[in-house]
């Protein structure tokens, strides 16, 4: 019997999906998402390849990916790893950024400078937002925790993206 498990939830107001999961051994093949990912490794070591590097996320570390970043997943230790994650849709995030930062031009997007962060405050803020969405707290509580998270991760990190030609 496998000790792997996955618990998925979706917030009806924001469309944000949350996942809490535990994997041992091979967790998932290389893939990508159309959303921004931000999560916290709760226990164990989560090993993944991203941006042409092998990354080891330990308990308490935060991992963040931009849309379409290819990554995989593996548990190098026999006891596996547990993580929690939020999937933030780019359009929702863009609207939220413009609401929080009124000087945010339409043609700018959030850029994740590094996929792994050792930042205790960010881990706490991310876990709070996860819990409030995953366990369906009141909307005002969810909205506030998301605003705190977005303000923390944005911290002035903007990069002009080239517009796609039609």
Protein language model regions, located:
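Amphipathic alpha-helical segments enriched in hydrophobic/aromatic residues interleaved with Lys/Arg
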Residues: 102-166
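N-terminal regulatory/effector-sensing and dimerization cores
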Residues: 5-106, 135
């Amino acid at each position: 019997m496998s000790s792997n498990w996955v618990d998925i939830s979706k917030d009806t107001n924001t469309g944000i999906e949350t996942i809490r999961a535990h994997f041992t051994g091979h967790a998932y093949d290389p893939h990508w998402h159309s959303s921004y990912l931000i999560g916290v490794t709760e226990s164990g070591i989560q090993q993944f390849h991203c941006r042409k590097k092998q990354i080891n996320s330990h308990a308490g570390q935060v991992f963040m990916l931009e849309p379409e970043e290819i990554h995989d997943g593996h548990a190098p230790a026999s006891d596996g790893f547990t993580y929690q994650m939020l999937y933030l849709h780019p359009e929702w995030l863009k609207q939220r950024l413009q609401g929080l930062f009124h000087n945010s031009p339409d043609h700018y997007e959030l850029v994740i400078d590094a996929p792994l962060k050792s930042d205790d405050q960010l881990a706490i803020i991310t876990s709070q937002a996860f819990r409030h969405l995953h366990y369906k707290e009141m909307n005002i509580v969810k909205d506030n925790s998301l605003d705190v998270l977005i303000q923390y991760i944005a911290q002035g990190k903007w990069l002009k993206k080239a517009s796609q030609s039609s």
